[in-house]
Structure formats: structure tokens, C-alpha cells
Regions:
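Mature-chain termini and adjacent capping regions
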Residues: 1-167
């Protein structure tokens, strides 16, 4: 009987926690996937299959992800993209860590940005959605005007479509 009461209290606390998280996040974050569960130990939703994490201004898509709705952090991998449709910005890669607090998405594993006049490909890209500056590092290839240039690191102004620093 004591075990049953303890189990009921635990389930009640889990439900309250989940409902409070949904209430905090429902105005600004939408999360969908083929399957999901809440991992109590990490405080994250674990998502698999056609994962979409949407805010008012950006979408993260992936095969798998972990999402913390309290800290607004996303860890995702497999066919990852980070998109801001209103700005026509779309990064692709193998994995991403995104943090609302840092206003940054870090894309790793063949990170690519394709624009009408330029394609940038690198091992890693860090995109700050407040400044709209993307920093590419690790064998950076810039395909532009029929030419390919290779750099170690570049900074790219996504709004003005220009490289602002290259090394």
C-alpha cells in the first residue's frame, strides 16, 4: 500500500512537471516528432523521427533530438537543418546544438549554407541569429562566381550576403 501511494505521488509530480513545462513553452515553442518521451533525469523530451522544433522565427529539423523546454536548448542529429524562412536562411549538417540564451546554433558534420549566389561548406558553423553572422571553421570551401576558395575560418554576414572576414 505504501509503495502504491509513493508511485501515485511520483506520477502526480511528473504530470505536474510536464504540464508546467508545456505551459511555459507553448506560447513560443512547438515540438513534433513520430515518437517522443520525457526523460525525467535530464529534464528533456527525447524525440525520434521527423523531428521539428519550431519557434516564431526559426525551425530545427532532424532525425533525432533532445529538447529542454525550460532552458530552450536543442541537441539534434541526423539530417539536421536550421532554418529562418522569413530571412531565406537554411543551414544543413550532421548535428546541431542550439541555445536560446546564447542566440546561437552550432552545426557540425559537413555544415552547409546555400544561397542563390554562394555556397559555403565547412566542418563546423556557428550561427548567431541575433547578429545574423555565421562563422565557418575547419576546411571551409566557398563556392562563388564559378570559383572555389578554401579557408580555415570565415565570418559571413547572412543578411548582407557577404564575407566579412576570411583566414
Amino acid at each position: 500500500m505504501i509503495k502504491l501511494k509513493l508511485l501515485m505521488k511520483s506520477m502526480f509530480l511528473v504530470c505536474v512537471l510536464m504540464l508546467s513545462m508545456v505551459g511555459v513553452s507553448s506560447a513560443s515553442v512547438s515540438v513534433t516528432s513520430d515518437s517522443k518521451y520525457f526523460d525525467i533525469s535530464s529534464g528533456c523530451f527525447v524525440l525520434e523521427g521527423k523531428v521539428l522544433v519550431k519557434t516564431d522565427t526559426r525551425t530545427i529539423g532532424a532525425d533525432k533530438a533532445r529538447v529542454n523546454l525550460v532552458t530552450k536548448e536543442v541537441w539534434a542529429n541526423g539530417n539536421v537543418y536550421v532554418e529562418e524562412p522569413q530571412e531565406e536562411i537554411k543551414f544543413k549538417g550532421g548535428s546541431v546544438y542550439a541555445s536560446d540564451e546564447l542566440k546561437t546554433a552550432i552545426i557540425k558534420g559537413d555544415a552547409i549554407l546555400e544561397r542563390p549566389d554562394i555556397t559555403i561548406q565547412a566542418e563546423k558553423c556557428s550561427f548567431n541569429w541575433r547578429t545574423k553572422i555565421a562563422e565557418f571553421s575547419g576546411l571551409v570551401e566557398v563556392h562563388q562566381d564559378g570559383k572555389t576558395n578554401v579557408y580555415d575560418v570565415i565570418q559571413y554576414d547572412v543578411i548582407n550576403n557577404k564575407i566579412i572576414d576570411a583566414k
